Amino acid sequence: MSYSLSLPAWSIGVDCYKEIYKYTHIYGKKAAVIGGKIALEKAYGAIAEALAGTDMVLSEPIWYGGQASYENAEMLKAMDAVKDADMIFAVGGGRAVDTCKVVAAHLGKALFTFPTLGSNCAGCTAIAIMYYPDGVFKDIYYGERCPMHCFMNSAIVADSPAEFLWAGIGDSIAKEYESELAAREKKLSHVPTMGTTIAKACTAPLMNYGPKAMELIRAKQAGPELDECVLAIVITAGLVSNMTISTDGGKEFFFNSSAAHAFYYAATVAPECAEHHTHGELVAFGILVLMALDKNWEALKEFQKFAYSMKLPLTLKDIDLKEEELPACAAKAADPSVVEWGRWPYEVTQEDFAQAILEADKRGREFLASL
């Protein structure tokens, strides 16, 4: 049986929008520009300026709806500006980009992404994380191919809120730990072997360049350390996602994530936690849950040191999650919609998962008390 894999192309730099026409014009002349409100305010003018003097025609800025939901995808699909376009430019953060993936796939249009945050790998992955309109996780949409090209404008990313890069570091540094756990004791074929190997390349750049990248973004300055972190978050982590997930008939596998992301989805049912804390922030605490579940105490101690240095969460209090909410969280983690559940080589009950959360919290409080 044949197997195909679509991988992304990318451009990064303060002037990378100069490359837009080069990589898009072969797909047509009309682009629907869809994204978040703030992202469109920051990027639309720069995109339009880069395409001035070409035959590319941009739509007016189109708000994606504010949530990565199928309802918003349907709303966008019904718009004439979207239906009449040859391609879609997805501008903004993960939820805006993921909504556009569904729209582009359903309408059969080429998709180009313009991340304005260094917070996640959505800009170069085929999958889309979809939610109900109220923000509770619904499912993962598996697209057949990645976006055609990802344009990461360093100046625009540098002007974004620092907490998004901070959260992106917390999210992407999970790749090595999660893919190792998910693939442990498995016999891997070519592509997932590549993916789990590339996952190891996420960790060092984020640990080495993360502190300096945070200094730069707080100062609203572009720089090589910021670029290295953005590349690790958007591209390296994205490549891992593309190479560790397959829904191709006869070639299904999933080694992309495990307990840390299961914790994130679990936390979406806790209103205060979900409302006030980002995806990456919760995944970072989920890494501690993973290590507690795996009883990997030495790794947990080392990650606590990094998390503390980056001000990532170490306790339930840090993420506004209450102990009485844990049974509902564990039930959500074990829901069939959460494909990360069970991506470990041993039996885990909902009670075990809740206990691992409590253990991570306990050890976090002990770590802080020891300082």
What is each model feature region?
Residues 3, 19, 172, 296-371:
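C-terminal charged capping/lid subdomain of soluble metabolic enzymes
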Residues 2-4, 24-26, 80-83, 104, ...:
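Solvent-exposed alpha-helices and their adjacent loops that cap or buttress functional pockets
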Residues 189-306:
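Active-site segments that bind and position negatively charged phosphate/pyrophosphate groups
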Residues 8, 105-202:
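A glycine/threonine-rich phosphate-anchoring loop and its flanking beta-alpha core
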Residues 17, 40-44, 95-102, 120-124:
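Short glycine/serine/threonine-rich phosphate/pyrophosphate-binding segments
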